[in-house]
Regions:
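Short glycine/serine/threonine-rich phosphate/pyrophosphate-binding segments
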Residues: 82-93, 112-114, 165-168
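Short, small-residue-enriched loops and turns at beta-alpha junctions
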Residues: 29-30, 57-61, 112, 133-134, ...
Length: 177
């Protein structure tokens, strides 16, 4: 019966053609891996479905701290932090690095989590048209003029590598230049 089995990284179309399925979070076909399923059941029995709270209150478990230590060691850094979901990560990283008085120039097509992070940061936000490098340059020039009258402040450009809302890819070399 169609639609009753887990989708994998590849799907067969009605015309017989096999294509990559980028509309699924099952990119690596973990859903069909019996070893991972068994391990997931063991973890659920030991820890339940989630910590249900912020890390410093009652949301941290030994497996979280072990994983953070392992990742930090792998990266060769003193420490790291992991989040339970991508939205939390995205929306909290921006305000962690920026603050009131900073200027952030952002692509108008960034996803909702990035928009929330920009809002939470309380920085001044200037928008440029989606993937429009000429408009980005125009906005940056205006920021430069505005900053001539104000004390030194930090500036950031915020974009996505692969835009969640449009599927477009950013021209990162153009932004960096």
């Amino acid at each position: 019966m169609p639609g009753t089995r887990p989708t994998g990284p590849k799907v067969k179309l009605s015309n017989g053609r096999t294509v990559n399925n980028f509309a699924s979070y099952n990119f690596f076909n973990f859903v069909s891996n019996e070893l991972l399923k068994d391990r997931a059941v063991q973890v659920l029995r030991n820890y339940g479905v989630g910590a249900c709270g912020p890390p410093n209150f009652y949301g941290t478990q030994d497996v979280h701290m072990d994983t953070e230590r392992d990742i930090a060691k792998f990266l060769g850094v003193p420490a790291c932090i992991i989040y339970a979901q991508a939205f939390s990560t995205i929306s909290s990283v921006i305000p962690a690095f920026s603050k009131r008085g900073d200027i952030i120039v952002a692509d108008k097509a960034v996803n909702f989590a990035i928009q929330k992070g920009l809002q939470i940061s309380r920085s001044t936000i200037r928008w440029y048209e989606h993937n429009d490098m000429e408009d980005l340059e125009r906005v940056l020039e205006q920021v430069k003029k505005d900053m001539a009258r104000k004390p030194l402040t930090r500036r950031f450009i915020v974009t996505e590598g692969l835009f969640e809302n449009t599927g477009d890819i950013v021209d990162l070399p153009a932004i960096v230049s």
